[in-house]
Amino acid sequence: MIKVVNLTKRFGDHEAVSSLSFTINKGEIYGIVGPDGAGKSTLLRLMSTILEPDEGSVRINDVNVYDHPYAIKENLAYMPQKFGLYEDLTVEENIHFFGRLFGLSRSEIKKREKRLYEFSRLAPFKDRLAGNLSGGMKQKLGLACCLVHSPEILLLDEPTNGVDPVSRREFWKILYELLADGVTIVVSTAYLDEAERCNRVAMMFDGRFITWGSPQKIKNSMNGIFVELITTNPLMSEMLLKNVSDFKGIILTGQSLRLFVDDIQEATLFMTSILEKHEIDILSIKEKLPSLEDCFVDIVVRGA
């Protein structure tokens, strides 16, 4: 449904998006995951035709979006990080306003309103000013405004950034409902736990995809054994072990340390020889299933 080929965008000497090529299938949630500055927002702006690339192409349903930008507008919706709601208009007025922008008649908007209120749970607040909504409710309203013209493809740029955990879960529940309706969703996020919810994920760093696939495929493709290490001094242990090239990808989570090793027994002996010099004991080391965050950190560190 979406085919991206050698997509590149430069700002001066900085290459924000570097020769990306990938495809997105109809009816899937495709996650673009990475830290701030990775190039996620630039990529979505390119895909939505807000920006034009220096090189490469994006094709939607075999139509080049840069040659025929208006041909794909009715099938596409893009929600930026800060969606332009009119805060002095009510929830209902915002939906009607964006519906008219998309060329819908008042009767068409009225027909679609019920469904928009159903999935967004905003019906009780339709007469409330948008400026008086919570952050999570504003995001739901922004999504409703994007969907008023019933697009086939939805591009979402960090839609849950700065939103409380409960609202994040509710937002993802809405996305799954849209997925069940056949909408193709491309979502960028800095939250790696959210990436676990996607059908497929591309991890982005410094304008490039460093790995991609289903969350499980990415985890299965990692080299080494993932372990959880508990010591008598986790903070000092992290500082000491990070100085060793084999353990640069170590992550301190609560009171435990998480990392990939080639061999548990050899790694235990090596770490013990380092830590015991500082009177730190290893209490346990156990094999665990890695998260996408564990994989991302290890890939970035090993590639550094």
Pin down the residues of each PLM region:
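ABC ATPase "signature
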Residues: 212-213
